[in-house]
């Protein structure tokens, strides 16, 4: 199987997101890279499912809460930007303060 660099990056994001969600389900708090992976995977999946940029941005606010992550992680993530391919083309999705 041959993957482009972009496809490889998406695969790594989804793998890390899966590991992070398993840890979250065990009651463990997520660290910075895990939180970024979960939010990024949410954006990529939302685009793939046919959601609009606005729907993805609104839904991302409910993915992780401050109780789900280690202390200080919400402060480290004032902005996450993910490029995703939507039905109308590639868009840069900006998540401002995604962890509430």
Curated annotation (Swiss-Prot):
Cross-referenced Gene3D superfamilies: Urease, gamma-like subunit
Keywords, comma-separated and alphabetical: Cytoplasm, Hydrolase
Keyword Hydrolase: yes
Protein task: Disrupting the ure2 operon has no effect on urease activity or pathogen survival in BALB/c mice when administered orally.
Stated family: Belongs to the urease gamma subunit family.
Subunit structure, as described in the record: Heterotrimer of UreA (gamma), UreB (beta) and UreC (alpha) subunits. Three heterotrimers associate to form the active enzyme.
Protein name: Urease subunit gamma 2
């Amino acid at each position: 199987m041959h993957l482009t660099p972009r496809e490889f990056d998406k695969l790594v994001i989804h793998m890390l997101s899966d590991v992070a969600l398993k840890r979250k389900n065990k009651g463990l708090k997520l660290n910075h890279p895990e939180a970024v992976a979960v939010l990024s995977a949410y954006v990529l999946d939302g685009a793939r499912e046919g959601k609009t940029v606005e729907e993805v941005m609104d839904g991302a606010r409910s993915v992780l809460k401050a109780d789900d992550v280690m202390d200080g992680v919400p402060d480290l993530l004032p902005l996450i930007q993910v490029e995703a391919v939507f039905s109308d083309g590639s868009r840069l999705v900006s998540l401002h303060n995604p962890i509430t």
